[in-house]
Amino acid sequence: MLVLGIETSCDETAAAIVKDGREVLSNIVYSQIEIHNQFGGVVPEIASRKHVEKISYVADMALKEADIDIDKIDAVAATYGPGLVGSLLVGLSFAKALSYARKIPFIAINHIEGHIYANFITYPKLKPPLIVLVVSGGHTNLIILEDFDRYEVVGKTRDDAAGEAFDKIARYLGLGYPGGPAIDKVARHGDEEKYKYPLADVEGYNFSFSGLKSAVINHVHTLNQRRENFKVEDVAASFQKAVVDTLVEKTIKLSLESNIKRVAIAGGVAANSKLREELSKRCSEHQIEFYVPDFKYCTDNAAMIASAGYFKLIKGQTSSYSTNAVPYISLVSKKE
């Protein structure tokens, strides 16, 4: 079964064709990073206009790369939220129109949920149950995936998401956009033990990063006021360590307490080298299987959306054309 995935939630225009939810035949991504970098972040109006310009071209390229005629597509899946409303509407409208014109099913996908399915692309034989840590620019969730399309959200951020904290600290340190890769890069040359930044003691499996963000900003401000010399690399490395430590600690704790010895990560922050390294090491220490998507499936892409669409389709879960873009939507526990 062939599903065409469409992803336009932020600043990437993406289309992909995935066979049976796991085999990627094409994965096309048009990135706007260079355009938005000059502004220090994504400009919503520019992002949506670029999506309008590129969506047809990107979808056509996905078909060509897969060497698939559009008549062979069984369904089309698109992100409906969360994200920038103007950007979401472009991909959603395109997918609905294609579905209507070709008389094929349309499936609306939660972007955060889509990230989870990137693991089933990288590991075709992987099956639930497993623990999934979803870490992206706007969301941080700790999930027990009981079955395909059935999961329990046991932890989430109370304020800033991990990726959001990375972006804000990177901007404050003058490292540019996107912040995650920028901090990851400079932190490799810093001393992560140089500064001890506090993390909020949040109950259960929840997270909080706003206090850490403020602590780093105030610390750097104080150093500048006192005209004390410091290395940006040390600040970046120490900040990154604090974030990674809390993500890893709670993920391992959930795996051990739930007795689910499979852990996967997903989302843009899953590309962070420190997070991948530390979680892999801790999983190995506790004989826990560790899964992480290929780098190209960590950041926003349409292959993960197509994969998620397939697993909904085989359960008969299609969407109505009245489905609208929802810019602010969380991942909530889903039971059959």
From Swiss-Prot:
Cofactors demanded by this protein: Fe(2+)
Residue sites binding Fe cation per the record: H111, H115, D300
Keywords carried by this UniProt record: Acyltransferase, Cytoplasm, Iron, Metal-binding, Transferase, tRNA processing
GO biological process, one term: tRNA threonylcarbamoyladenosine modification
Catalytic activity, EC: 2.3.1.234
Pfam families membership: TsaD
Residue spans crossing the bilayer: none
MF GO annotations: iron ion binding; N(6)-L-threonylcarbamoyladenine synthase activity
Binding site for substrate: V134, V135, S136, G137, G138, D167, G180, D184, N272
Iron recorded as keyword: yes
InterPro entries to which the protein is assigned, alphabetical: ATPase_NBD (IPR043129), Gcp-like_dom (IPR000905), KAE1/TsaD (IPR017861), TsaD (IPR022450)
Catalytic reactions of this protein: L-threonylcarbamoyladenylate + adenosine(37) in tRNA = N(6)-L-threonylcarbamoyladenosine(37) in tRNA + AMP + H(+)
Annotated compartments: Cytoplasm
GO cellular component, one term: cytoplasm
Keyword tRNA processing attached: yes
Cofactor: binding comment: Binds 1 Fe(2+) ion per subunit.
UniProt family annotation: Belongs to the KAE1 / TsaD family.
Family annotation (HAMAP family): TsaD
Function: Required for the formation of a threonylcarbamoyl group on adenosine at position 37 (t(6)A37) in tRNAs that read codons beginning with adenine. Is involved in the transfer of the threonylcarbamoyl moiety of threonylcarbamoyl-AMP (TC-AMP) to the N6 group of A37, together with TsaE and TsaB. TsaD likely plays a direct catalytic role in this reaction.
UniProt name for this protein: tRNA N6-adenosine threonylcarbamoyltransferase
